[in-house]
C-alpha cells in the first residue's frame, strides 16, 4: 500500500508486486514536518488502508510499516485486520504498538530510549545485524585498508530533506584538499531530492 506522492516508486513496485495506491488528500500541505508526510490525518489514512484490506479480502500474516508519520494511533486500528506488525523505525521518540521493531540506527545500549514508547511484548531489533541492505552488497569483498581507498559512494536517501548530501560533499572536498588526496566521490540523489540541481552544479 503506497501513497501517490511526487516521484513515488509505485510503477517500479508494480513490475514485480501488487501495489495498492492511495490518493493524497492535500499534497500542498506536505512539508519538512514528518507528521505531514501522509498528506492527511493518520485516522483517514488507516481507514483507507483498512478499506484496501477488506475490499481485496487480504489475509495478512505480516504487515511491514516503513513511514515516519505513522505511530501507535495508526497501528492500533490496523492491528484488528492483520496477524502481526513489523515497524521499521529510525527514531525513538514515537509510540508504537507492534510485534517487531527494527532500528538499524542505534545499538543495544540505546534500546532504553524506547522505554514507555513501545508495547512490552515487542521484539526490538537494533544495530548492524538488522541492516536492511540488498544481499548483493554482502557478497562484495570489502577492502578494509582505508589508506588504499580511492572511491567513495555518497547516498543520503531518496529525498534528503535537510540536504545532508551537500554538507558531506563540502567535508569530503576539504578532506581531499587538506590531506593532498584525490579520492573520487560518486554522489547519488533520489528523484524527490529538491536540491538535486544545486548539488549537480556543485560537483
Where are these regions (language model features)?
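Short internal beta-strands
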Residues: 1-4, 184-191
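Nucleotide donor/acceptor-binding cores
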Residues: 61, 149-152, 183
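Conserved nucleotide-sugar phosphate-binding/catalytic loop shared by glycosyltransferases and other
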Residues: 2-51
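Nucleotide-activated donor-binding/catalytic signature segment of Leloir-type glycosyltransferases, i.e.
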Residues: 197-203
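A conserved mid-protein helix/loop that constitutes part of the nucleotide-sugar donor-binding site
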Residues: 159-173
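Short N-terminal targeting/anchoring amphipathic segment
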Residues: 50-69
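Conserved nucleotide-sugar donor-interacting segment of glycosyltransferase catalytic cores
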Residues: 69-116
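A nucleotide-sugar donor-handling region in carbohydrate enzymes
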Residues: 97-162, 190, 196-197
Amino acid at each position: 500500500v503506497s501513497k501517490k506522492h511526487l516521484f513515488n516508486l509505485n510503477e517500479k513496485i508494480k513490475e514485480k508486486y501488487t501495489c495498492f495506491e492511495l490518493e493524497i488528500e492535500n499534497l500542498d500541505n506536505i512539508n519538512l514536518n514528518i507528521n505531514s508526510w501522509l498528506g492527511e490525518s493518520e485516522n483517514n489514512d488507516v481507514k483507507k488502508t483498512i478499506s484496501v484490506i477488506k475490499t481485496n479480502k487480504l489475509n495478512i500474516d505480516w504487515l511491514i510499516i516503513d513511514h515516519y508519520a505513522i505511530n501507535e494511533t495508526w497501528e492500533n486500528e490496523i492491528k484488528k485486520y492483520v496477524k502481526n506488525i513489523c515497524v521499521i523505525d529510525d527514531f525513538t521518540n514515537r509510540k508504537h504498538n507492534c510485534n517487531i521493531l527494527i532500528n538499524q540506527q542505534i545499538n543495544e545500549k540505546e534500546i532504553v530510549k524506547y522505554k514507555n514508547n513501545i508495547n512490552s511484548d515487542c521484539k526490538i531489533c537494533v544495530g548492524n545485524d538488522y541492516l536492511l541492505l540488498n544481499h548483493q552488497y554482502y557478497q562484495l569483498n570489502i577492502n578494509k585498508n582505508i589508506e588504499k581507498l580511492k572511491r567513495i559512494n555518497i547516498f543520503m536517501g531518496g529525498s534528503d530533506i535537510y540536504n545532508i548530501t551537500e554538507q558531506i560533499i563540502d567535508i569530503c572536498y576539504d578532506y581531499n584538499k587538506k590531506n593532498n588526496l584525490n579520492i573520487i566521490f560518486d554522489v547519488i540523489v533520489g528523484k524527490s531530492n529538491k536540491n538535486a540541481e544545486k548539488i549537480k552544479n556543485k560537483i
